[in-house]
Every structure is written in C-alpha cells, then in structure tokens.
From Swiss-Prot:
Compartments in which it is found: Virion
Reactions listed under catalytic activity: ATP + H2O = ADP + phosphate + H(+)
GO molecular function: ATP binding; hydrolase activity; structural molecule activity
Binding site for ATP: 82
Protein name: Helicase VP6-A
Family: Belongs to the orbivirus VP6 family.
Keywords: ATP-binding, Capsid protein, Hydrolase, Inner capsid protein, Nucleotide-binding, Virion
Entry's EC annotation: 3.6.4.13
Compositionally biased spans, kind Basic and acidic residues: 8-30, 37-55, 67-81, 163-177, 186-202
Listed GO CC annotations: viral inner capsid
Top enzyme category: hydrolase
Length: 301
C-alpha cells in the first residue's frame, strides 16, 4: 500500500509541470489556446483530487478509513448470494427434524419389553391416544424379538380394532356430509349450497393414526434409536444346583422349582407335586428373557 501511494503521489508530481506550462502559455497571451488550456487545467485538477482522495482512503486513519483487505471482504459478501453477511451463520435455520414431531409406539407390553431388553430403548405402548404413530411388528421381526404366540395374537387384535374404528368413523363422516347436502336441497337453496361447499374445507379422511409395518431390525432401529445389545453368555459361576429337570420323578430330591412358559403340557402336575414338599422354594418368571432369569436364579441358589 505504501508503494502504491508513492507511485500515485509520483504521478501527481508529474502532473504539476504540465499545469505550470499551461499557466506560462496563458501568460504569453496566446488567445486561441487559452480556453483549451483552462479546460485541460480543470480536468487535471479533478484527476489530482481523485488521486488525493484514493491516497487518503488507503493510508488514512480513523473509523472512516478501511484497508484493501476489509474492502475486498465486503465486496465478496455483497456478491455472494449464499452469504448474507461477514459474520453471519451460514447454517442458520438448518436443523434436525423428527417424524412429524411425534414418537413411535407399539401395541403390546410384551413387544415394548422385548425392544427394551434387546436394544436398550424404552418405547411406550399405545393407549388409544390420537394422533399416534404405531409400529406394527411383522413376522420376521417377531421371531428376532422372541415374541410369543400370545403377544402376536394381541397385536393382531388391536390392529383389527383400530382399523374397524377408522372405518366406522369414515362412514360416519360420509353419512353426516350426505345429510347436510340433503337438508340444503330440501330448502331449495342450490346457489347457496354451491357457495358454501366451496367455502367449507374438506374433512380429514383418517383419525390421525399412522400404522407402519416393520420387518427388519435396521428399520426398527432407525425409527426408535438405540443399538443391538451384544449379550455375553450367562453361565453359573458356582452353584449347589446339580440337576435341572422337568420330570415328576425328580420332585423327591428337589429343593426349589421355577415356573416359566416352556411349552411343557405336564408342568402343572410337576408343580402340584413339588408344592407338597415343605422344604421346597418356589420361583416364577413374570416377564423378560426366561433363560437369563433362570440362569440368574441358579447363580443365586
């Protein structure tokens, strides 16, 4: 910037001899060139003033003076359509969005427990609230989560109830709309009817419930968050338990019994015989992973 100022000032120094020559020529009394000499002098003075102004802008001090670097940045900001200011936030207004601002729910307690146990994510159970976003766990994912037949049947029943309710409400809205139109026709006000039909907004075609079928674990995790838990095998470290059996013949030497859904049709007979012993302890599973709870019980014993 200093070199540029010196070169400009040098240019200004070169202009001055021309002004002196023009002044001398005018003093010699050349009438034919006096007018043109004055025009040249005024143009040179304007050029000198422009040079002085640029030099002052470059090397001056104070709040009104700006260097080339700052001025260049301003020009870039004005010319760029994406950046609105030198200190503005380019990413302003960009944020993460959820699924219609709502949370996904499931239809049964068993499915909610299975998801929390496997992925560590707590998910609510649908309680007839509207609007709602419901996850329908389909067959392949049911096996992955270990959902029982009873749990599958419960989900199916609730889905049927929801669809039946939606269908009945849709029919009710259509019937109500038909009654309104019929009433208007009876009064013979056809013109008013057409005007009001244009002004009346369409009624919603659903009850605000979204049902999303999910077959894969990947899609489920993308909807609810969480990661699959890699469960380490649980084994008995040291226990006095020598035998685990569901045979009625082993009740005689048993010291504890544990009831859980295993598919054994004779479990009631075994439990009945075991309960007759006074020195036997009874344990039961109320939910969760039966295998894990049973192994924890063995560790406890």
């Amino acid at each position: 910037m200093i070199d540029w100022a010196e070169s400009e000032s040098g240019k200004g120094d070169k202009v001055e001899p021309k002004e002196e020559n023009e002044a001398e020529e005018s003093k010699d009394g050349e009438g034919t060139q006096s007018e043109s000499g004055q025009k040249k002098e005024s143009s040179k003075e304007a050029e000198d003033a422009d040079v002085d102004r640029r030099v002052h802008t470059t090397v001056g001090s104070g709040s009104g003076a700006k260097g080339f670097r700052e001025r260049a940045n301003e020009n870039v900001d004005r010319g760029d359509g994406k950046v609105c200011g030198g200190v503005g936030d380019v990413d302003a207004g960009v944020g993460t969005t959820g699924t219609n601002g709502g949370r996904w729910v499931v239809l049964t307690e068993e499915i909610a427990r299975a998801i929390e146990s496997k992925y560590g994510t707590k998910i609510d159970v649908y309680r007839d609230e509207v609007p709602a976003q419901i996850i329908e766990v389909e067959r392949s994912l049911q096996k992955e989560l270990g959902i029982s037949r009873e749990g599958v049947a419960e989900q199916t029943e609730r889905l049927r109830d929801l669809r039946r309710k939606e269908k009945s409400e849709t029919h009710a809205r259509v019937a109500e709309k038909g009654r309104r139109k019929q009433g208007k026709r009876v009064h013979g006000d056809a013109q008013k009817e057409s005007t009001e039909d244009e002004k009346t907004p369409e009624e919603p075609t659903s009850v605000g419930i979204t049902i999303e079928g999910v077959m894969s674990q990947k899609k489920l995790l993308s909807m609810i968050g969480g990661v699959e838990r890699k469960m380490a095998p649980i084994g008995a470290r040291e226990s006095a338990v020598m035998l685990v059996s569901n045979s009625i013949k082993d009740v005689v030497r048993a010291t504890a019994y544990f009831t859980a859904p295993t598919g054994d049709p004779h479990w009631k007979e075994v439990a009945r015989e075991a309960s007759k012993k006074k020195n036997i302890l009874a344990y039961t599973s109320t939910g969760g992973d039966v295998k894990t709870e049973f192994l924890h019980l063995i560790d406890h014993l």
